[in-house]
Amino acid sequence: MNPQPGEIWLADLGLAAKTRPVVIVSRQDPDPPRALVLYVPLTTQRRDSPYEVPLPRLPFLDRESVANVQGLGSLPTVRLERKIGRLSGGIMQQLKDALAFALDLEQASE
């Protein structure tokens, strides 16, 4: 299993969150010290927050969704069940911008 940034996977997030779609946001590491990925969960609970990236209607999702960067997490790759799709480069850039905002990394490039 080799999840790539921008891919959407169904992931087992445990009892509280169950199985849900997540976007992989960690870089690909050919020799990872741990078999972990960073992810942002997708949700249908839209709050129009700067921590959300609205997604267009995607054929592999049942409903319109948002990527909620406040839910950023990590999990072992063995909890990824199956890949269901991929986000476009433009949406991934919006997701990166939202992550930079959430983590207060906007000043890092100045």
Locate the predicted segments by residue.
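Conserved functional hotspots at enzyme active or ligand-binding sites that engage polyanionic ligands
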Residues: 1-110
